[in-house]
Amino acid sequence: PLCRPEVHGEYIKLAIRVAGEIGVPVINTDEGKKAKWTTEDEDFVLIKYTLQEAAFVAERRGVKIGLEPHSQYSKTPEGLDRIYNLVKSPAIGINLDTGNAYLSGSDVYAWLENVAPRLVHLHAKDISVSHSDAERGKVTGTPVGCACGEGVLDWERIVRIVKEKCPRDIVFSVECGTPDQAAK
């Protein structure tokens, strides 16, 4: 998480170094949970600092940093763009988590269209109808979803947007609750 450089600054740089050594092309992160003792303006200074340091390491190793919508600032398209625009680096891109984007109350498809040119990874997470009814617009994300295609998201549309709008091949990492759901 980028808001806490004293805790996670070295961790993200280590993750990038390891990724570069073992051939992993993308690492993902978010801003993390807000500290109680900082203001929003201070948080963005901390995020910028951490992201600049991480981008410097990532550029030298050919690793991309995927910014994920998962917390208080990145839960909207405007907030994620604000973080993305803090540091100009070819190493920084977007990891759109479709489930988190949906649960935040945003239009997943419009958001995906907007970030497609910057997309470096996609967390393929579907959300069940009951999960949607209980949490949409109330949370910034969830660690697990349901099997892709069994929830509220239109996967044919998502795949079509990625194929048509992304300038690179994109890995879809499936995030669901069980191995059986992942196999579907």
Residue locations for each model-derived region?
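A structural motif
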Residues: 24, 119, 167-169
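Acidic/histidine-rich catalytic cores of soluble enzymes
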Residues: 49-152
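Active-site acidic/histidine proton-transfer and metal-coordination neighborhood
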Residues: 1-94, 156
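Glycine/Thr-rich phosphate-binding loops of Rossmann-like dinucleotide-binding domains
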Residues: 37, 132, 182
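A short, acidic, flexible beta-alpha connecting loop/helix-capping segment that sits on the rim
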Residues: 173-183
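Flexible loop residues that form catalytic
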Residues: 32, 127, 177
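H/E-rich (His + Asp/Glu) clusters that bind or coordinate divalent metals
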Residues: 147, 156-158, 163-165, 170-174
